[in-house]
Amino acid sequence: MSARLPLLVLALAQLVVALDFNIVYVALPAIGTDLGFAEHDLQWVVSAYVVTTGGFLLLGGRAADLLGRRRTFVVAASVYAVSSLVGGFSVAPGALIAVRAVQGIGGALLFPATVSLINTIYAEGPDRNRALAVWGAAGAGGLCFGSLLGGVLVEEFGWPSVFFVSVPLAAAVAWAGWVLFPTDVPPVAARSFDLAGALTGTAGITLLVFLLVRAPEAGWVNPSVLVSAVLSVALLALFTVVETRSRDPLVPGRLFGHRGLVAPIAVTAVYSATFSSLPYFLTLYFQEVRGYGALATGLAFLVPAVVVAVGTQAGERAVAAVGVHRTLAGGMALGATGAAVLGLALTPHGSYPLLLPGIVLVGLGQGAAWTCIWIAAGAGVAPDEQGVASGITSTGLQIGGAVGLAVLVALAGAIGRHPAGGPSAAGLRTAVFAIAAGIACGVPLAHAVRRTPAAS
């Protein structure tokens, strides 16, 4: 069997995850009107997905190692298909929020299973690097076409169509994964499932992500935020104790002594706090400052998505030439420069062409850095721990993104408010400049990533 067929399925899975996450944003106003959401509750159509995804990633990664990568992948894609179908038929706010929470669990199972499949099907080196670049480009495509496709579907067929479109894609991914991926091989040594670690770790991280999502809207002294903070700290402390005493911990402690994993986790958190927050502020700029509609906003993200996809491919080639750590540092430096240039162009009367130089620089740096992060995170990790390694790294991705967006939204709002309700143009510029500074902080972290020979 050609190695290209499994990669096609893995790339399609990443496209589905990215598409499903982004496509809902454009549909939110229609969903709110049709289902009668209170204004302050509508954000939970997105937040429910974010909270459960972030909370269950560690569990999803370990499930891939213990239960089998193919099995976990197929179950996760099936959960996506079924929950998307149910979501399209939702008739009440609570039902749709519950469906999105289930979709988030599906994503938490699917993402680490996908990464660990890449890292075990393709040998470390050029083959794996190339596969990760293709996978990353598919994710960039999903993020872009989510906005564009969402605008078209909502205008032509109504908001349920943004859920229905994922059903055949996710079902096809599940079927193809079962047919094409290698049969799961039982672990060489019998392992027990760390139930106590799974419960305390999943609950603690879920509450942590919840408070980070909830606090910017409700306030940091809101009772639900304070209770979540106390419980999260207590559960994560208990999780640490449980893990040190477990014979087969959910997260093997030796992984944190593995330089090739720890440094990418730190860079991933910075990456998500900065690069991943940028589309939020660009969307506000396009819609509230410049007055773009949903479809025009989707079209505005075409160029960034294409450039990010190009950056993922360029990153893979640069790794072969100069190594992972240099390419990652270069990508972060390029992204920081681009974000600074972009911030200068975010004026009340600016035009889209003025944004393009910054968009191109940011996109190239973002794409190259994304490929490098996952190359580094899987390097030198044993095959039977690839799932939990990707789960740990992707948990850093989720927590970093939640922290970064919360801080940046507060910063932008403190500078000034737009009449439409969001931050003013000055506030958006300040947030983007802060993003540039944050990305720059990732450059020295990138140099701590495990060195690889340029030709490997």
Q: Where do the protein language model's features map onto the residues?
A:
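Residue-level signal for the membrane-embedded core of alpha-helical transmembrane segments
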Residues: 55, 109, 203-206, 277, ...
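12-transmembrane solute porter fold
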Residues: 3-26, 39, 223-231, 235, ...
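Short linear Ser/Thr-Pro motifs
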Residues: 83-87, 183-185, 222, 390
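Transmembrane-helix bundle of Major Facilitator Superfamily
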Residues: 1-179, 322, 328-330, 340-343, ...
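Glycine/proline-centered helix-kink
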Residues: 112, 134, 139-151, 205, ...
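Hydrophobic transmembrane-helix bundles of small-molecule transporters
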Residues: 133, 155-268, 274, 292-293, ...
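Interfacial helix-cap and linker-helix signal at transmembrane-aqueous boundaries
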Residues: 31-32, 63-64, 149-157, 212, ...
